[in-house]
């Protein structure tokens, strides 16, 4: 049963949105300006494609230069109900002819050492509000970079042709 919204709910929502405009937005803009001026965030990303295959519930990753050399494996859980899928199920079995013939993309993102140092300094100086604002901004920027990288990888692998153009819609 859908609850109808009363006038009080509408006023609460409007007050909340006004608080965002009056209070939160200026703080965000202040921090974004400071981050740009002082170079507090230094976004970096590294990603690559590695040969891989499935061994039971594990995805086994191999060296791209020496395809028989195992770099590591990810033992993954299987769903406890429903179809009982495991992420490894979506990779080609290593017992198939030709060895590792699937690919797994790997990525890492960072906002840099300066961001880490700045957050620690704010916390140590008991500037908790500033610490939380800066830390939150850094985390959101790292997440956005990870999402952007993921979209790029999907595009490079040809999976993105039918996906929305706007990142927020992916």
Descriptions of predicted regions:
Residues 142-155:
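Charged, low-complexity helical/coil segments in non-catalytic cytosolic or luminal regions
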Residues 139:
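Short alpha-helical basic/polar micro-motif
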Residues 5, 9-132, 136, 157-159, ...:
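Active-site loops and adjacent core secondary-structure elements that bind or stabilize anionic groups
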